[in-house]
């Protein structure tokens, strides 16, 4: 009887310890929570006066999430898979690329003040660049001193929306809170702002993006 009771207490203590460790480690290593919000994509539609909202799961290092403003669709694909036929921007973790677009960071921290701080001057827009040392696909070897990367185009301007300082552990996350104007390949404009990079439980990699399309300046 006493042995069974002690075994029960030991098992309970172990379960509590494991639960606590999982909570701590999930915050450090950004593992998705099992009860995270399941509604992804275009959560609310933008109007001519107010931004809409896009919610995506960017926790997987092997996935690009493609966003199409015209059709209001999001598509998650493996980093090595061909891009969909129609898309405007894509997100990998906090990295971003565009479909032949150019991006400008503005001084506005909300869409309501955007018209007062920006003019669409061509010299301010930044195109994508090719990189083979930015898009991390495997973090499991970090403690061994190296990471795995995928070659990809990448937009350094739009990717400014969140700075991740990995010089210390855990990393320090600093959002710019800025609105980014995207000049799409057809000449129309879209605007995006990273409103949050965590879910309601504080798990990183769940991104809430405010957007306006078409954007009129």
Give short role names for the model-derived ranges:
Residues 22-217:
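Surface-exposed, beta-sheet-biased, low-hydrophobicity segments with strongly acidic/polar composition
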Residues 18-20:
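C-terminal motif of bacterial Sec signal peptides marking the signal peptidase cleavage site
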Residues 1-10:
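Bacterial N-terminal signal peptides that target proteins for export
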């Amino acid at each position: 009887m006493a042995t069974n009771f002690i075994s029960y207490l030991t098992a309970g203590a172990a379960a509590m310890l494991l639960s606590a460790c999982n909570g701590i480690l999930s915050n450090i290593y950004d593992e998705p929570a099992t009860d995270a919000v399941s509604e992804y994509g275009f959560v609310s539609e933008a109007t001519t006066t107010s931004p809409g909202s896009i919610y995506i799961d960017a926790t997987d290092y092997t996935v690009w999430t493609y966003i199409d403003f015209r059709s209001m669709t999001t598509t998650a694909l493996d980093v090595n898979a061909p891009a969909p036929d129609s898309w405007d921007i894509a997100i990998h973790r906090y990295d971003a690329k565009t479909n032949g677009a150019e991006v400008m960071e503005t001084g506005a921290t909300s869409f309501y003040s955007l018209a007062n701080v920006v003019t669409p001057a061509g010299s301010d827009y930044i195109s994508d660049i090719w990189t083979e040392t930015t898009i991390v696909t495997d973090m499991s070897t970090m403690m061994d001193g190296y990471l795995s990367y995928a070659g990809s185009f990448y937009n350094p301007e739009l990717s400014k929306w969140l700075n991740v300082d990995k010089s210390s552990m855990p990393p320090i996350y600093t959002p710019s809170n800025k609105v980014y104007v995207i000049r799409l390949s057809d000449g129309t404009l879209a605007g995006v702002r990273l409103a949050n990079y965590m879910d309601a439980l504080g798990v990183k990699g769940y991104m809430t993006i405010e957007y306006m399309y078409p954007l009129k300046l």
